[in-house]
Structure formats: C-alpha cells, structure tokens
Amino acid sequence: MKPNIHPKTYQVIFQDVNSGYRFLSRSTKTSDETAEWEDGKTYPVIKVEVSSDTHPFYTGRQKFNERGGRVEQFKKRFNMD
C-alpha cells in the first residue's frame, strides 16, 4: 500500500437534530462545535437530520406502497385483469 494516501480520521459525536440522540464514531469530517462525551473527553459534534434513532426503517414506522407497482396501476386503469 502507498503511504500517506489515506484520509485522517477523527473520533466525533454524531447528534440527531430531531431526537437529540448522540453516538460516538469515527469520521473524516470534523467540526468547530464540541461537546463532552460520557468518557469525560471532548469531541467535535456533527449534527445529522436522520439517524438510526429516527429513520422509519429502524423505528418500524415505515410506510409501504399499497397502490402497487406501475404494471398493476396500468392493468387497473385499463381493466386488464
């Protein structure tokens, strides 16, 4: 592998702006805003709009398309059973 080609990664806190849920992870992105984590250390905070705490797939509140696909809609429109 070539040396010095990989981006530098940092420990950061990701915070869901909708629920306030926070988790610590690694990222190449950093921020000027910081916060103290449970271990007593200070980390940059990156705010996200959707996380596993609020995404419908993970919360079980997802909606399914009950109208059917394009073929089913076409058949229904032209009475082709």
From Swiss-Prot:
It comes from Bacillus licheniformis (strain ATCC 14580 / DSM 13 / JCM 2505 / CCUG 7422 / NBRC 12200 / NCIMB 9375 / NCTC 10341 / NRRL NRS-1264 / Gibson 46). It comes from the Bacteria. Gene3D superfamilies: Ribosomal protein L31. PANTHER family: 50S RIBOSOMAL PROTEIN L31, CHLOROPLASTIC, LARGE RIBOSOMAL SUBUNIT PROTEIN BL31C. GO terms for biological process: translation. Belongs to the bacterial ribosomal protein bL31 family. Type B subfamily. InterPro entries: Ribosomal_bL28/bL31-like_sf, Ribosomal_bL31, Ribosomal_bL31_B, Ribosomal_bL31_sf. Disulfide bonds: none annotated. Keywords: Ribonucleoprotein, Ribosomal protein. This is Large ribosomal subunit protein bL31B. GO terms for molecular function: structural constituent of ribosome. One of its GO terms (cellular component) is ribosome. Part of the 50S ribosomal subunit.
